[in-house]
Structures are given as structure tokens and as C-alpha cells.
Regions:
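A generic structural signal for short coil/turn motifs at secondary-structure boundaries
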Residues: 181-185
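C-terminal regulatory/effector modules of DNA-binding transcriptional regulators
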Residues: 186-282
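Interdomain hinge/linker segments and adjacent boundary elements that couple functional modules
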Residues: 2-19, 26, 31-36, 42, ...
Length: 282
């Protein structure tokens, strides 16, 4: 696999290289001996260890089997796929516009049965109104100097909301109370968005919890993330959207979501927080 100019992907390759190096050291085998056993040129080991080349799935299997570290294979393979997808995702954002970015995960959304959302910055996307989407996407386009195909992006994102009403999809959503009060848009748009939360939480497919401000925290406020079944996590950072597929990392996000959900209030208590946010609009 050829090198990517993306700094995120480069960092991921270096991290994978460090893991390969640690596995090699723990095995007591030299790079020369590994290369000989694998039938590789010794320079290939150097490229993999130094992160200049991203290993293929077969490279990882061979490396780990020679080093007697087969248990590392699933996480390493997942990590290499994460590294590659980071770059592809960023390239799509920069070259193809926001509509394309909204459409990249449609098949994943349709296949997912249980969605888990933790939202510390924005409303969960299945419950966003078009007006709120416009405000968020406009700010995003301005900050990242992205193509402003906002109408098309709104249409693509809105189309995904049909999953709330179709099939056997379930949505577990946890929000920080501060999200209710962040003025991402004007008061009319915010009132409509907050009203949409009230409507959405009554759907049989939706569980909406809100972590009240001032709650004694068992787990700190963190970046917005979403979990798709138990297979994939997306984390939203300022510089990039990060894909996580390594099983042990996913397990940490599942644990984190469970703890955050345990700090939230639901039902009438959540409705009271939303109603108070509507009342606070001027």
C-alpha cells in the first residue's frame, strides 16, 4: 500500500510500525531472521517498522505467526484499515464536497441495527432539522474551507433520517445538556430543533438521555462519537473524523457509552431540560 500525504494516516502508519517492532522485540527474533522466514527482502521489514509502508493483511498474518503473536492479528488488521480510511475520508471531504461525505456511510447505516450516539457538541444527526443542519454544515464549510454544496448535503443527511421509521433500527442517544443551549443557529431554528427532540424522543425506536450540567461525573465530557452495532466507531475531532474498528478500542467506547448513559436522565426529566432550553430562548 502506498504512502498517503495525510498527516493522520502517516501517524497511524507509524503507530502500526511501532506495534510491529514491539511484537518483534518481544519474540526475540531479529528483523533479518523474520525476513528470511517470511521470504522477504530485509528492507521490507525496515519499511514496515518505520511506518513508510502500510502492511497488507497477509503481511500482518505472516509477521505475527513468525513472532508467535497470532492474538495481535485482528487488532492490527483493523488498525491498518483505519489508517487507510482516514485518508480516503479526508480526500472525499476536500475534493468531492459535503454531499459526498454524507453519502459515504449509507450502506453502513442501513445495515446497522443498534446506533449509539454520544453528543457533546451537536444534536444527534437523526433528529436534526434542516435548519439546524444548515447552520452546522455552513459553519463546518467555513472553518474547513470545504465546498459549499450545503443544499445537497442537507438532502443527503435528511434522507438518512428515514431509518428512524423503517425496519428494526434502534437509536440510543446521549447528549450533554450544554448542547441544548449552544446557539448554533438563530432562535427560531433552535426552537424548532429543540421541538424536534421532544417529538423524536417519543418514537419507539429512540431512547434519548441528557446528562444535566453540574452532574457529578463518573466519566468526563469527551468528543462526540457514534457506535454502529459493535463493529465500528466514528469519533469527531476538530481536524478529522476518525474511524475505529479495532475490537479492544471498540470495547472501550462501548464501556464509555454505558457509563455516560448511566449519568443521563430520561423521560419527563429529559423533557423538562429541553423545555427549559426552549424557554431560555429570547
Amino acid at each position: 500500500m502506498s504512502a498517503s500525504p495525510s498527516s493522520s494516516a502517516q501517524q497511524a502508519r507509524r503507530a502500526i510500525g511501532r506495534r510491529l517492532r514491539d511484537i518483534l522485540r518481544d519474540s526475540g527474533i531479529t528483523a533479518r531472521a523474520l525476513a528470511h522466514a517470511a521470504g522477504w527482502d530485509e528492507s521490507k521489514c525496515s519499511r514496515l517498522i518505520n511506518g513508510r509502508t502500510l502492511p497488507s493483511d497477509d503481511d500482518i498474518r505472516v509477521w505475527c505467526r513468525i513472532c508467535n503473536a497470532e492474538n495481535e492479528i485482528p487488532d492490527l488488521i483493523a488498525a491498518t484499515r483505519d489508517a487507510d480510511s482516514m485518508y480516503v475520508e479526508w480526500r472525499r471531504l476536500q475534493r468531492s464536497g459535503m454531499r459526498r461525505l454524507q453519502e459515504t456511510r449509507v450502506s453502513l447505516y442501513e445495515e446497522t441495527r443498534l446506533f449509539r450516539f454520544y453528543c457533546s457538541q451537536f444534536m444527534p444527526w437523526p433528529l436534526q432539522t434542516p435548519g439546524y443542519m444548515r447552520a452546522v454544515l455552513s459553519a463546518f464549510a467555513d472553518f474547513h474551507d470545504a465546498p459549499r454544496d450545503i443544499d445537497e448535503a442537507i438532502a443527503a443527511r435528511s434522507a438518512r433520517s428515514r431509518l428512524l421509521y423503517e425496519g428494526d433500527h434502534r437509536f440510543a442517544m446521549v447528549m450533554e445538556e450544554s448542547v441544548l443551549h449552544d446557539r448554533i443557529a438563530d432562535d427560531d431554528v433552535m426552537a424548532g430543533q429543540l421541538g424536534q427532540l421532544l417529538e423524536g424522543m417519543s418514537l419507539p425506536s429512540v431512547s434519548l438521555g441528557i446528562i444535566p450540567s453540574g452532574t457529578r461525573r463518573k466519566l468526563w465530557t469527551m468528543e462526540t462519537f457514534s457506535i454502529y452495532d459493535d463493529k465500528r466507531v466514528f469519533v469527531e475531532l476538530l481536524s478529522a473524523g476518525v474511524t475505529v474498528t479495532q475490537p479492544r478500542e471498540i470495547a472501550l467506547y462501548l464501556k464509555g457509552f454505558s457509563e455516560l448513559a448511566g449519568q443521563a436522565v430520561y423521560g419527563n426529566k429529559a423533557r423538562s431540560l429541553i423545555t427549559a432550553a426552549i424557554g431560555a430562548l429570547s
